[in-house]
């Protein structure tokens, strides 16, 4: 223990609501947390999380990895938008797939992501009208697990009564629960809380920090942020070009997944259908296999057989990646460029089983195309792509074996990851621009 420093835990309730308030997708469908400027304190984001009691209707069954939030919005005390992540539910599934199978197994009881355990045996547990306590890890670069530094909320102005305002928008019922009969199923959140760990320093330490700020110093807080781009695949052709316009000074990673353009709630869900790709709103398409509602693996015909990224006159990689005879090269390329090619293989690289056979999850439902523009692992240095330099779009050229819209209309969901810095300045002001 460092002299003059102590840790304590507190919980922040949604603004203007009591602890037993019920949030649903149609009424009270936004959670707002106003993070106070705690005196002499820093937030330890690694030890902080959102918790709530997740309830279903009597005929509702949670999808194997329920994502109750579709959008995350984080503002400073002066209203500046620091993070705005639309389709954060899809981003959450994407990063869950990049965890190891062992991690997902260990977290299943808290997160209700049961995909790494026996899904069929847990089917009955995913309907609970009395509720299940669920932990949600924020997909936030500032207040989530991605933040590697303590967040100095005590040094931020709170003239409005808070240092940050966090807004979470609830997802539609169809993407959180399926129906075990032919009637619509619903879900709700109760007992919602943002459990936070604070690191509190002494008055003497805080006085030294305030003195440095008063003399013109500033506190840099690096953080990641993500931007969502969704583009529909149009026409009946097998070649599609996706242009993404994003002005980022330090663009590090890109992730693209292929998904249905729309989703309707699945009905008459059983423990067998529960496993099917077509019953999971967060299945990613582009691979060569699918687990059907009957429990059998089927061959897909509309798989991706070639792709390449392009920015300006430069291709990434230098020549298109041809996926022959399967999608293994896309998997290994994504793992290598994201520095995931080690002994702790992610969940999307494991096998999915049915009663008689196994196939790679990457082929059956977790297909993703990823690329990292980071030139080195050094932190604090601009090593990504400056896409604001020329204004040219980033293009993803896709070649399919057959028309990807033949079975159902699809879209390409792309997330742009960039690195920013929040500068905390004298008098508690903050900005993403230094000095």
Where are the language model's segments positioned?
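Short, low-complexity Pro/Thr/Gly
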Residues: 1-435
């Amino acid at each position: 223990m460092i002299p003059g420093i102590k840790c304590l835990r507190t919980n922040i309730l949604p603004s203007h609501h009591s602890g037993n308030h019920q949030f649903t997708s149609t009424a009270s469908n936004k959670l707002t947390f106003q993070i106070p400027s705690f005196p002499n304190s820093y937030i330890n984001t690694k030890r902080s999380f959102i918790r709530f009691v997740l309830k279903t209707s009597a005929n509702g069954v949670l999808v194997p990895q329920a994502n109750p939030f579709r959008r995350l919005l984080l503002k400073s005390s002066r209203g500046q938008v620091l993070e705005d992540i639309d389709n954060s539910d899809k981003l959450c599934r994407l990063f869950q797939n990049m965890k190891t199978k062992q991690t997902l197994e260990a977290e299943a009881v808290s997160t209700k992501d049961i995909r790494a355990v026996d899904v069929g045996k847990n089917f009955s547990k995913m309907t609970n009208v009395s509720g299940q306590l669920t932990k949600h890890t924020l997909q936030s670069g500032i207040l989530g697990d991605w933040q590697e530094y303590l967040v100095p909320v005590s040094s931020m102005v709170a003239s409005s009564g808070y240092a940050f305002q966090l807004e979470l928008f609830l997802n539609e019922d169809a993407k959180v629960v399926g129906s075990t009969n032919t009637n619509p199923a619903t879900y709700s959140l109760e007992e919602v809380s943002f459990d936070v760990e604070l690191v509190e320093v002494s008055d003497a330490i805080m006085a030294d920090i305030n003195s440095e700020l008063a003399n013109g110093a500033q506190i840099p807080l690096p953080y990641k942020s993500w931007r969502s781009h969704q583009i529909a695949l149009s026409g009946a052709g097998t070649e599609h070009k996706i242009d993404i316009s994003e002005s980022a000074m330090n663009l590090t990673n890109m992730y693209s997944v292929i998904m249905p353009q729309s989703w309707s709630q699945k009905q008459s869900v059983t423990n067998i259908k529960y496993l099917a790709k077509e019953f999971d709103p967060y299945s990613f398409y582009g691979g060569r296999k699918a687990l059907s509602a009957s429990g059998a693996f089927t061959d897909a015909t509309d798989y991706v057989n070639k792709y390449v990224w392009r920015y300006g006159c430069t291709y990434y990689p230098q020549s298109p990646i041809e996926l022959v005879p399967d999608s293994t090269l896309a998997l290994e390329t994504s793992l290598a460029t994201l520095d995931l090619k080690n002994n702790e293989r992610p969940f999307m690289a494991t096998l999915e089983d049915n009663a008689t056979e196994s196939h790679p999850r990457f082929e059956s439902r977790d297909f993703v195309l990823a690329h990292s523009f980071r030139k080195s692992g050094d932190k604090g240095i601009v090593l990504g792509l400056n896409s604001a330099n020329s204004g040219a779009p980033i293009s993803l050229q896709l070649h399919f074996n057959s028309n990807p819209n033949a079975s159902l209309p699809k879209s390409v969901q792309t997330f742009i990851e960039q690195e920013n810095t929040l500068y905390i300045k004298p008098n508690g002001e903050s900005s993403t621009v230094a000095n």
